[in-house]
Amino acid sequence: MANNKSAKKRIQVAERNRLVNKSYKSTVRTLTKKTLANCEKYKQEPNSDNKDLVLVSVNQAFSLIDKAVKKNVLHKNNGANKKSKINKVVKDFLTSK
């Protein structure tokens, strides 16, 4: 355990940041899963409403990934990799009919 005041404060700050980062990462995973679920829904029933739902969920996921990269929660390469994987899956679903 830390002995001086500044070390104790750093422990508190690190714990606070860890929880915030965990929240961001969890939300990124959730939005990714929702996007993939919407793609499956579109594959089963291709119509314009489901297509719009897929595009909206992709935009939300990309936006949150970009924000996480900007706040150094994710490394920029990791964020680009996540976006690339989502984009590849969505592109495959939207082009295959």
UniProtKB/Swiss-Prot annotation:
Pfam families attached to this UniProt entry: Ribosomal_S20p
UniProt entry keywords in alphabetical sequence: Ribonucleoprotein, Ribosomal protein, RNA-binding, rRNA-binding
Gene Ontology BP term (one): translation
Example of a GO cellular component annotation carried by this entry: small ribosomal subunit
Gene Ontology MF: a single term: small ribosomal subunit rRNA binding
InterPro entries: Ribosomal_bS20, Ribosomal_bS20_sf
Keyword flag RNA-binding: yes
Family named by the database record: Belongs to the bacterial ribosomal protein bS20 family.
Entry-linked PANTHER family: 30S RIBOSOMAL PROTEIN S20 (PTHR33398), SMALL RIBOSOMAL SUBUNIT PROTEIN BS20C (PTHR33398:SF1)
Keyword check for Transmembrane helix: no
Domain of life: Bacteria
Task performed by this protein: Binds directly to 16S ribosomal RNA.
SUPFAM superfamilies in the cross-refs: Ribosomal protein S20
HAMAP family named in the record: Ribosomal_bS20 (MF_00500)
Taxonomic lineage from the root: Bacteria, Bacillati, Cyanobacteriota, Cyanophyceae, Synechococcales
Protein name per the record: Small ribosomal subunit protein bS20
